[in-house]
């Protein structure tokens, strides 16, 4: 009979049960909240508290990746990282540090908006209800957050400062010579003072207001661009590259995504490519995460090469040049044609009205004119995903645009094609095709019967087509033009080619990035409005700070206009654009009342999470987004060369590129502009693993309730029906969700916390086993029984010394636990506490000198029962700020040492000698122990390895 099923009379009145755990936990949670136990004092301002027990102490800022409050609430996998950081933060408070640990909510985004569209319920209503549910669930777990610092990105007093940060970025430009952002006003001063040339060389005073504005806007870190974007008709919005899956579909909804040229807000994150890459070396992050960011940034060294063009009968003025970037400029002698992305800006300029004489029919796409060929091909290409366009296995397609370019090193006229395997968003959107050294170019050349020139000597025995390896340059000389690469290795050939290009004005050495500028606008409702209006000329104007926040207005229809998922030619229509009384506004921006039009896009969900860690530091400040002194105290650099940032940031590895890269970019801009002292937001990153679960399917493949499945002899059954077991994530659709609420009801929050922390290393994924939770419950019951008499409720703790063996065990455990806690090895900590508890329960009475350290070491994991036991042992204040136990070094030294004794390589005995015994004493004891094995023989050699073993050679 289980305890839960046993008659109440059979259970001792003061036994630790789920009901008692619930009463204890709720009482202590109320106490902590009432007394502000986990409030962390700031150095100054309204959150300062000079009387706090940790005022002036060494600080520690522990941060969780804050959750999106979904309607489903938490399952047991979600709190794993939150419990881990709570255990770490609780330990650090007891170790003497002033710990800031807060929790907020990343609450804007598409799920709430989609739910609003389906139900008509305002997204704020559902989101606030979800936040309330999350708060209740997290509170039930006993998480020690400073609730005064909680924020939600949907609150106007929070997104006011999100808008303010956007304006700092908008009103800044990146000075590549200084390698930092500077205010736009300083750029204008350089233009007007003549120290910086305008793009066309005219004096600043000769430019019209519109021309000046255009020049300045080209430098802004936040700017509007008519650019190729990921348009998703099925969602009715554009998406960032990072929100598109590898197969070219939307991450949310799985709709097809198309490349379209649309007017959108962008952020010039590419300006920070080098710093984002180089500063990874200063971060204490997992190496796989750093590698993912390095690959995403994708720095490449090579050259930009300019190819002059000629376009008979086209509308082109002069000779437009096509710029390509290549990592192998040394292969330019093999460039026999150019390929542009169908969306490339120069295509329309270069297309003539008629085909040149002698154009092969295969090049024309069967069309009567270049313009018809280009239009037809573009339509087909727009319907393909990026993955489909770049598939290695597909047959190469394309059309000749009717114009030629000049290869600068050979002088040869080479045809210009458009083809879908070149993407506008990567590089310059144009490539020089070298079929001899590139497999895709070779395949294209074969389809269109284009020349193939090898410029690298293939390895001996090579019988393939394109040779992509290294080798000496061949067919790479035009002496009359002053360039001869034949016989050179790749590195020298590249260097010589770049020098020749730069000397002749044909190109230059360059570094490029896979990283693209960040698409920052969304055609949605549920997001931060932009603090931007447009005047009668369509010029963007930043609103002054005193007009912030620009609040999100009420609307009748929350949905952006969506389209047939395959309608690539559709155009965005935003929900805010339908609130004309909000869109069209009269404002006085310093030159009298005028009519303006508001920006009707909203910011992406990532905006609030780019800076929320700063608002936790000073959440009530109405004058600044964060007080500089608070930022320096909690996030400032520790010394010369230190990057600063949070001391610990815990979250899932799935955010390796998106959130982490965007947040680093925003933080660096704020650092450049003098708003923060740290140049990285997160000094140390820790990725927790995932809690996964078994799911079960019947013969139809339908999921069945996991809790109703039983195992019999290694086979799984639902009733009498055999089912299949699979392992993976936990989810409602898989019918295997277990919630923290269920576990707290069955065992208490402390048991749930101990179980999650004991399942394995925090960074490793692990399977959830509901049946195993009872083991953690029984452990806490043993701790309780060691200290509390289950019949009377009286304390069993006595003020008598522990025996020597128990005392030495205690200090060994304390020493090990401290090391484990610092390294976040929580599972091994709990194993040590179980070992100590088992030893304690074998004693006839419980010595205080063992019980109190045990409870203090247990407190980070099971804080409620630890507080209760601490109080029952006679303490009147919370153990939150009690000193964590420290081991006595003298008790860590063993009194005796056990030596295995080998004879001719086999262990024949063991001896125990005093720890300070000399070698002769050890030798004599060893020989005595194996005398029978020696059978009277005199050993030839006796080797004593101090503290480890004795080896006897007979």
Curated annotation (Swiss-Prot):
Compartments, as annotated in UniProt: Cytoplasm
Keywords linked to the UniProt accession? Aminoacyl-tRNA synthetase, ATP-binding, Cytoplasm, Ligase, Nucleotide-binding, Protein biosynthesis
Q: What is its main location?
A: cytoplasm
* Assigned EC number: 6.1.1.4
Motif span ('HIGH' region)?
67-78
Q: Where does ATP bind?
A: 732
Cell membrane as UniProt keyword: no
Q: Could you tell me one molecular function GO term of this UniProt entry?
A: ATP binding
> Sorted alphabetically, which Gene3D superfamilies does this protein's record hold?
HUPs, Isoleucyl-tRNA Synthetase, Domain 1, Valyl/Leucyl/Isoleucyl-tRNA synthetase, editing domain
Where does the UniProt annotation place the signal sequence?
A: none
Q: Kindly list any coiled-coil regions of this protein.
A: none
Q: Kindly give the InterPro entries that the UniProt entry links to this protein.
A: aa-tRNA-synth_I_CS, Leu-tRNA-ligase, Leu_tRNA-synth_edit, M/V/L/I-tRNA-synth_anticd-bd, Methionyl/Leucyl_tRNA_Synth, Rossmann-like_a/b/a_fold, tRNAsynth_Ia_anticodon-bd, Val/Leu/Ile-tRNA-synth_edit
Spell out the reaction equation it catalyses. tRNA(Leu) + L-leucine + ATP = L-leucyl-tRNA(Leu) + AMP + diphosphate
NCBIfam families from the entry? Answer: leuS_bact
The UniProt family comment states: Belongs to the class-I aminoacyl-tRNA synthetase family.
Q: What is this protein called?
A: Leucine--tRNA ligase
């Amino acid at each position: 009979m289980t305890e839960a099923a046993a008659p109440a009379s059979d259970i001792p009145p003061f036994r630790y049960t789920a009901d008692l755990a619930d009463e204890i936990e709720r009482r202590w949670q109320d106490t902590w909240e009432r007394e502000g136990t986990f409030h962390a004092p700031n150095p100054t301002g309204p959150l300062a508290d000079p009387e706090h027990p940790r005022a002036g102490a060494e600080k520690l800022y522990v941060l969780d990746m804050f959750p999106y409050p979904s309607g489903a609430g938490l399952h047991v996998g979600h709190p794993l990282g939150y419990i881990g950081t709570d255990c770490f933060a609780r330990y650090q408070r007891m170790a003497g540090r002033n710990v800031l640990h807060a929790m907020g909510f990343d609450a804007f985004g598409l799920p709430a908006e989609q739910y609003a569209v389906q139900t008509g319920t305002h997204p704020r209503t559902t989101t606030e209800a979800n936040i309330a549910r999350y708060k209740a669930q997290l509170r039930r777990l006993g998480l020690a957050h400073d609730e005064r610092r909680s924020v939600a990105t949907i609150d106007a007093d929070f997104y006011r400062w999100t808008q303010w940060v956007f304006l700092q970025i908008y009103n800044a430009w990146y000075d590549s010579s200084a390698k930092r952002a500077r205010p736009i006003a300083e750029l204008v001063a350089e233009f007007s003072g003549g120290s910086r040339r305008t793009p066309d060389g005219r004096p600043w005073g000769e430019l019209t207001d519109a021309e000046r504005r255009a020049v300045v806007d080209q430098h802004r870190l936040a700017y509007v661009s008519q650019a190729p974007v990921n348009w998703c008709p099925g969602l009715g919005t554009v998406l960032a590259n990072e929100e598109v899956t590898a197969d070219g579909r939307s991450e949310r909804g799985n709709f097809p995504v198309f490349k379209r040229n649309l007017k959108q807000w962008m952020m010039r994150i590419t300006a920070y490519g080098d710093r984002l890459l180089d500063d990874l070396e200063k971060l204490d992050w997992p190496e796989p995460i750093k590698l993912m960011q390095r690959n995403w940034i994708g720095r490449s060294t090579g050259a930009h090469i300019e190819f002059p063009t000629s376009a008979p009968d086209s509308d082109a003025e002069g000779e437009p040049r096509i710029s390509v970037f290549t990592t192998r400029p040394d292969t330019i002698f093999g460039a026999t044609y150019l390929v542009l992305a169908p969306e490339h800006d120069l295509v329309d300029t270069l297309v003539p009205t008629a085909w040149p004489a002698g154009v092969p029919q295969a090049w024309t796409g069967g069309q009567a004119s270049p313009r018809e060929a280009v239009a037809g091909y573009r339509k087909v290409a727009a319907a393909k995903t990026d993955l489909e366009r770049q598939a290695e296995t597909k047959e190469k397609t394309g059309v000749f645009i009717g114009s030629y370019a000049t290869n600068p090193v050979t002088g040869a006229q080479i045809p210009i094609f458009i083809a879908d395997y070149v993407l506008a968003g990567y590089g310059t959107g144009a490539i020089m095709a070298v079929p001899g050294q590139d497999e895709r170019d070779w395949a294209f050349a074969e389809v269109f019967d284009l020349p193939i020139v090898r410029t690298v000597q293939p390895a001996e025995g090579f019988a393939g087509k394109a040779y992509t390896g290294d080798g000496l340059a061949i067919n790479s000389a035009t002496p009359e033009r002053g360039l001869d690469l034949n016989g050179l290795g790749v590195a020298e050939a590249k260097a010589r080619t770049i020098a020749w290009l730069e000397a002749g004005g044909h190109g230059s050495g360059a570094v490029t990035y896979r990283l693209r500028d960040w698409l920052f606008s969304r055609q949605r409702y549920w997001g931060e409005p932009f603090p931007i209006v447009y005047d009668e000329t369509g010029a963007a104007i930043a609103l002054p700070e005193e007009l912030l926040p620009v609040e999100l207005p009420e609307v009748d229809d929350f949905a952006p206009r969506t389209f047939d998922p395959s309608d690539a030619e559709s155009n965005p229509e935003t929900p805010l654009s339908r609130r004309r009384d909000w869109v069209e506004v009269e404002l006085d921006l310093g030159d009298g009342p005028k009519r303006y039009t508001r920006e009707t896009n909203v910011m992406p969900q990532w905006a609030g999470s780019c800076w929320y860690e700063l608002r936790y530091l000073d959440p009530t400040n109405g004058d600044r987004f964060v007080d500089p002194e608070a930022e320096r105290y909690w996030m400032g650099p520790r010394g010369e060369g230190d990057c600063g940032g949070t001391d610990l940031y815990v979250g899932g590895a799935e955010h390796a590129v998106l959130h982490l890269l965007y947040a680093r970019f925003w933080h660096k801009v704020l650092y450049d502009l003098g708003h923060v002292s740290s140049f990285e937001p997160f000094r140390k990153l820790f990725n927790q693993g995932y809690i996964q679960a078994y799911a079960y399917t019947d013969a139809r493949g339908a999921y069945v309730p996991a809790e109703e499945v039983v195992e019999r002899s290694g086979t799984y059954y639902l009733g009498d029906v055999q089912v299949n077991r699979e392992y993976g994530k936990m989810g409602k659709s898989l019918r295997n969700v277990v919630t923290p609420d269920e576990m707290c009801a069955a065992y208490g929050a402390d048991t749930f916390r101990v179980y999650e922390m004991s399942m394995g290393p925090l960074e490793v994924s692990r399977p959830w086993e509901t049946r195993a939770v009872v083991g953690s419950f029984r452990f806490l019951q043993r701790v309780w029984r060691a200290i509390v008499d289950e019949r009377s409720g009286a304390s069993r703790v006595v003020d008598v010394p522990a025996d020597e063996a128990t005392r030495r065990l205690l200090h060994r455990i304390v020493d090990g636990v401290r090391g484990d806690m610092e390294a976040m090895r929580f599972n091994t900590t709990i194993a040590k506490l179980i070992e100590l508890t088992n030893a304690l329960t074998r004693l006839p009475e419980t010595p205080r000198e063992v019980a109190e350290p045990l409870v203090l070491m247990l407190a980070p994991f099971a804080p409620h029962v630890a507080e209760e036991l601490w109080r029952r042992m006679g303490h009147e204040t919370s153990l939150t700020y009690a000193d964590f136990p420290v081991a006595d070094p003298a008790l860590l030294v063993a009194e005796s040492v056990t030596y295995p004794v080998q004879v001719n390589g086999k262990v024949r005995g063991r001896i125990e000698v005093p720890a300070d015994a000399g070698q002769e004493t050890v030798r004599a004891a060893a020989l005595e122990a194996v005398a029978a094995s020696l059978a009277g023989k005199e050993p030839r050699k006796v080797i004593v390895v101090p503290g480890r073993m004795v080896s006897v050679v007979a």
